[in-house]
Regions:
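A short acidic, often aromatic-flanked loop/helix-cap motif at beta-alpha or helix-coil junctions
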Residues: 60-67, 112, 135-138, 184-187
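Alpha-helix N-cap/loop-to-helix initiation residues
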Residues: 22, 88, 137, 159-160
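Generic secondary-structure signature for well-ordered alpha-helical cores
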Residues: 38-41, 74, 122, 168-173, ...
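Short gly/pro/ser/thr-enriched loop/turn and capping motifs at secondary-structure boundaries
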Residues: 46-48, 111-115, 159-160, 184-187
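A contiguous loop/helix-start segment that scaffolds small-molecule binding in enzyme catalytic cores
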Residues: 10-14, 27, 78, 146-216
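Class I SAM-dependent methyltransferase SAM-binding "motif I" and its flanking Rossmann-like core
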Residues: 87-148, 192, 196, 200, ...
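Short, conserved loop/helix-junction motifs that constitute active-site signature segments
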Residues: 32-35, 99, 144, 168-173
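Class I S-adenosyl-L-methionine
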Residues: 1-107, 114-115, 198, 207
Length: 216
């Protein structure tokens, strides 16, 4: 029989690494990572593990990291590390557009949203979850006004103070504004304040915001 040898294709693993420190990495996710030859992810995540790694690259169509996976998965077991849980605003959405379901596995993780509500000792079953991390939300004020509890993933381009100012500019008042900073890290801090006060706070770091109606 002639022709080139056929190499089996390794499944790609999309792995939720949790909200920050390795303390919140699940045992199943850790075992999956240990079985990978190469990890794709942000330096904040890949530096937690000894394997060879590459940063995620979203450029191009398909994105450069997807192209790398397609070209190398026959000879490498590749793990894609995402913060929190893969099902919540992660690179999983990109992977699912280019790979059939049988070609990848998803390892769930603990999201920063879960940890934030755990810290507050509140349910998040009724929360609307939005992300401004690397994206725009053109209808933010209407969505916040329509829901009694909203969690927002932020990034440096959309810090909590800018979110508070935008909501105030649309006339939204009377909401509690909770800033969860660097969750799971030693410097973790949670600030419960108002929209008006939050608009003046100079904050940076890994931040999540929860906006909810004040208790009567």
């Amino acid at each position: 029989m002639s022709g080139n040898p056929v190499h089996p294709v390794n499944r790609v693993f999309v792995i939720g690494v949790g909200p920050g420190t390795a303390d919140y990495l699940t045992p199943v996710a850790r075992a999956c990572i240990e079985g990978c030859d190469l990890l794709l992810g942000s330096p904040r995540l890949t530096r937690l593990f000894p394997q060879e790694s590459r940063p995620l690259d979203f450029r191009g169509d398909p994105p450069a990291s997807v192209k790398y996976i397609l070209e190398n998965r026959s000879r490498q077991k590749i793990g894609v590390l995402v913060s929190g849980d893969p099902g919540l605003y992660s690179f999983l959405g990109v992977i699912s557009r280019y790979l059939p379901p049988e070609d990848y596995e998803v390892m769930p993780g603990i999201s920063s949203v879960q940890l934030a509500f755990a810290r507050l000792k509140e349910s998040w079953a009724d929360a609307l979850i939005l992300s401004l991390h690397g994206r725009q939300e053109t209808d933010l004020a209407r969505k916040v006004a329509a829901h009694p509890k909203v969690a927002i993933l932020t990034d440096p381009s959309h810090p909590p103070q800018a979110i508070a100012r935008a909501l105030l500019a649309h006339g939204l008042k009377g909401r509690e504004f909770i800033i969860c900073q660097d969750l799971s890290y030693p410097e973790e801090r949670i600030v419960r304040t108002t929209l008006e006060e939050a608009a003046q706070l100079p904050l940076s770091g890994s931040l999540l915001v929860i906006i909810q109606e004040k208790a009567p």
